[in-house]
C-alpha cells in the first residue's frame, strides 16, 4: 500500500530488526566505543540493552565481559583514562571528589582505576570549590554578607557539589568582595578533605 504522496512511510517499510549475531554485536561495540568515551561496564550495559531490544540469533549467549576485556586490551577502552578525564571535567565545572566518586561508581569504574582520578580531585579540590562558589555567588563572590541561614544554604550547596564540610564552611565564611590568600587556602585543605 502506498502513502498518499506515493512513498511508504519508513515505519511501514521495515519490519522488526533482525536478531544480532556475534559479528554484528562486535560491530555495534566498535561503533559505540568509537563514538563515546566509555568504560567496560557501560559497554556491557549498552550491548545488553541492544540484545534485549533485538534478540540473539546464535545459540549460546554472548560473553560480553570477554568482549569488553578484549577492547580494553586493544586500548579501545581505558577505565583509568575515563576516570581521569571525568575528574578534570568535573573539577573544571566546580565539583568535588565526592561527586566524582558517585559518577565513577555509576559508570562502573572500580577502585584501582579511580586512584589517579581521586589524586587529581584532591589536588584540584580548592580550585574546584572556588569555581563552584564563583558560579553560585558564594562567600567571597557574593554580593553581600550572608546571614547564618543563607550561609547554611551555601554550605549545603557546596556539599551537594561534592566538597567536604570543612572546605565548604571555610569558603562560605570568606567575606564578600575581599581578597583572600589562595595559596594559604590550598595548603590548609590539601589533606583535610581527602
PLM region descriptions:
Residues 1-194:
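An alpha-helical, amphipathic repeat domain used for nucleic-acid recognition
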